[in-house]
């Protein structure tokens, strides 16, 4: 639910330059974790016309073919020809990854794993609300679904003139905290030069927008802005430079919840920017799934080298069945939010991260994956397997 009468969120496709960078960073992380699950990885990526640069710090015994990883990500997204503005097969790849600082390592590593310190200071937020089936805000959920559908229509050949870069934006109308309508939809998609605007608009409206947005939420005054500038032929890294970590609101809750500022992609689970944000989502989602509140935002903070959180705060915005203080006690009693405990609780030491790097880290479906000999569940932070225990502990 929302205290707003109107709320807008945006998303971007896997072919957006910043998302290319995120996916490359997480593909590097996955490749290293697949060989050395205790590796320390911080990988940043920059993509621009004809070049991809990876930089950062890594501590690992593994060897991976970084250039091959970078090229495969770009090609899999669909940038496979100079005709679309970028070609993963021929672009330059520059690697300037170095070793992790020993000063950071001594603050994180411990002889007893459960005493592992946080990889940095910082504050992280988790959020959930009951306004959608996936316990996410509706505007960001619809925005993700639009660009996901754009990619499906492009890759399947349903709309063969689509190109990889795309952005979406959805404005939802709320009454008494519930979504009652969609007032505006913006969808900008890169396309081939030979498609007419009439055909593009018709195809996008019928096969993307109407496929995603529930008909009962559309009304006579809903505004549809499909490629509002007219042409969107030049896109991807030619049109804009892409950087890891530039879409942190797209990655999370579309602005409906607060954000601590730390990006996710390219970071192994010892970095609480990522793992504690996942844990925050897990806690908040289980609170809402348990019926303890209709809406919940949790904040956790850490100090570098210290295992225990500095603080745990929580707000149910007046929707809680219990006081926020009592729910915080339930959180402390049922969730261990030390870094190592989070990694264990959510089973994070697997090569699952490239799958998170487009279309949002939250509101996804837990899915079993097999990479090499490793079979695991991705998106474990979306499980509601502690809801019953929370409900029982609350006496509901």
Curated annotation (Swiss-Prot):
Binding site for L-methionine: 57, 100, 240, 271
Reactions listed under catalytic activity: L-methionine + ATP + H2O = S-adenosyl-L-methionine + phosphate + diphosphate
PROSITE patterns the record matches: ADOMET_SYNTHASE_1, ADOMET_SYNTHASE_2
Subcellular location: Cytoplasm
Matches recorded under SUPFAM superfamilies: S-adenosylmethionine synthetase
Top enzyme category: transferase
Assembly and binders: Homotetramer; dimer of dimers.
Transferase as UniProt keyword: yes
Protein name (Swiss-Prot/TrEMBL): S-adenosylmethionine synthase
Cofactor(s) the record lists: Mg(2+); K(+)
EC nos: 2.5.1.6
Role description: Catalyzes the formation of S-adenosylmethionine (AdoMet) from methionine and ATP. The overall synthetic reaction is composed of two sequential steps, AdoMet formation and the subsequent tripolyphosphate hydrolysis which occurs prior to release of AdoMet from the enzyme.
Organism this protein belongs to: Pseudomonas savastanoi pv. phaseolicola (strain 1448A / Race 6)
Record: residues binding ATP: 16, 165-167, 240, 246-247, 263, 267
GO cellular component: cytoplasm
Family: Belongs to the AdoMet synthase family.
Pathway: Amino-acid biosynthesis; S-adenosyl-L-methionine biosynthesis; S-adenosyl-L-methionine from L-methionine: step 1/1
Region of interest: Flexible loop: 100-110
Transferase among keywords: yes
InterPro entries, A to Z: ADOMET_SYNTHASE_CS, S-AdoMet_synt_C, S-AdoMet_synt_central, S-AdoMet_synt_N, S-AdoMet_synthetase, S-AdoMet_synthetase_sfam
Pfam families referenced in this protein's UniProt entry, alphabetically: S-AdoMet_synt_C, S-AdoMet_synt_M, S-AdoMet_synt_N
GO-annotated biological processes: one-carbon metabolic process; S-adenosylmethionine biosynthetic process
Membrane-spanning segments: none
Listed GO MF terms: ATP binding; magnesium ion binding; methionine adenosyltransferase activity
Binding residue positions for Mg(2+): 18
Details of cofactor binding: Binds 2 divalent ions per subunit. Binds 1 potassium ion per subunit.
Superkingdom field: Bacteria
């Amino acid at each position: 639910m929302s205290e707003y009468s109107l709320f807008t969120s945006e998303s971007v496709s896997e072919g957006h330059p910043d998302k290319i960078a995120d996916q490359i960073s997480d593909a590097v992380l996955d490749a290293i974790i697949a060989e050395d699950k205790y590796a320390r990885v911080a990988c940043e990526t920059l993509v621009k016309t004809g070049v991809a640069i990876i930089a950062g710090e890594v501590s690992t015994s593994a060897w991976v073919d970084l250039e091959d990883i970078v090229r495969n990500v770009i090609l899999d997204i669909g940038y496979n020809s100079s005709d679309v503005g970028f070609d993963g097969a021929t672009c330059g790849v520059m690697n300037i990854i170095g070793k992790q600082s020993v000063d950071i390592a001594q603050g994180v590593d411990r002889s007893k794993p459960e005493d592992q310190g946080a990889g940095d200071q910082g504050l992280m937020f988790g959020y959930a609300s009951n306004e959608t089936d996936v316990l996410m805000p509706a505007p960001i959920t619809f925005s993700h679904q639009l660009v996901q559908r754009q990619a499906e229509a492009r890759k399947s050949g349903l709309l063969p003139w689509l190109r990889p870069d795309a952005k979406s934006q959805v404005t939802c109308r709320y009454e008494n905290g519930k979504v009652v309508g969609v007032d505006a939809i913006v969808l900008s998609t890169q396309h081939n030069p030979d498609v007419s605007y009439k055909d593009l608009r018709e195809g996008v409206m019928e096969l993307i927008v109407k496929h995603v947005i529930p008909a009962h939420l559309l009304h006579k005054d809903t505004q549809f802005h499909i490629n509002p500038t007219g042409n969107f032929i030049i896109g991807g890294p030619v049109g804009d430079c892409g950087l890891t970590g530039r879409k942190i609101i797209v990655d999370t809750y579309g602005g409906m919840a607060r954000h601590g500022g730390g990006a996710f992609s390219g970071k192994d689970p010892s970095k609480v920017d990522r793992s504690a944000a996942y844990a925050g989502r897990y806690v908040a989602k289980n609170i809402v799934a348990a019926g303890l509140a209709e809406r919940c935002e949790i904040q956790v903070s850490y100090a570098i080298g210290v295992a225990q959180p500095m603080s745990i705060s929580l707000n149910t915005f007046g929707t809680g069945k219990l006081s926020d203080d009592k729910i915080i006690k339930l959180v402390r009693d049922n969730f261990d939010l030390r870094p190592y405990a989070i990694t264990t609780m959510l089973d994070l030491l697997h090569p699952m991260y490239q799958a998170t790097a487009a279309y949002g880290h939250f509101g996804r479906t837990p899915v079993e994956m097999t990479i090499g000999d490793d079979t695991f569940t991705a998106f474990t932070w979306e499980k509601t397997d502690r809801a019953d225990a929370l409900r029982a502990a609350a006496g509901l």
